[in-house]
Amino acid sequence: VTLIVAGYNQNKYVWDKDSDAAKIPDRRSGMFLLADSLISTETPSGRKALVSEFRKIVEVQIDIWEPHFIRETFNNYLKVYQSNKCFIAFAGSTLTAQHIINNISGHLSQLKIDFEEGINFKCVVRKPCDDNNLIRLGNSNQYGEDIFVPQKDYHNLLSAEFVSDVVEHSINKALDSKMQYVLDPTALAAMRTDIILAITCPIERRDYLYKYKFASKVTDNGVIAYCDKTFIEADELAIIGMESVYGSDINQVAKAALSTHNYKENITEFVAQCVREDETNEIGLPIAIKTIDGNRTTKEFIKE
């Protein structure tokens, strides 16, 4: 079990459009993620620690590949046009999480610029598993020199919302591939994994946090596992892992800290206290503190 908390830095504020008396973070100052680092297992004599200093927040590269042309003919994707970073944090089954993260990384590292069919020419970004017009048409089509011009056609193609959709797709594909081995409710519970995405939108330059909660439902074809995506508002936190145990208290600390200039610090201090005082062997030190603001990332640790 794990405790992960993610929130927006509180350096700048704007008026809440739904309240004339409240200010909320402007979501332009970066995000922070806190995670314990203990991996434990249940034994006949109780829960025992297996590994400490386990990474539960992973930096994932986002690469958009641009099309290469020989004269007016498409000739594959040979060069990365744009790179960005995001954080993926997980709580739950480490095996399922590794499968999910591999799937997310595989998708986000192979995004490709394509064109949308229609009257007006328009470039779009596609997942590697999407239908791709350039690849489909191959060298049978000719493209004029006035299109696929990076300076005018490749700007503002990658949004945080698009990345969040790719992550959602990747999680669901990973869960779907594991369901063939799930034979009973115990096996289903064992694969439960929740995910947090933190990314600064390359277009808006605003910060976005998303939480993906593990869910399942019964259909005519059996049980389906999937993720339920939620956008985290400016004055909220994303909490996964031992949310049912510590979530309420952490949210109370966060609410009280909104009016201070020590929002991240107060939350970090309280989370550290929770981890230090936990006697279940489900969470443990050190605590990783990671931040992301655009493509700038930092990390530090609380070891005692």
Indicate residue ranges for each PLM-predicted region:
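N-terminal nucleophile
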Residues: 1-304
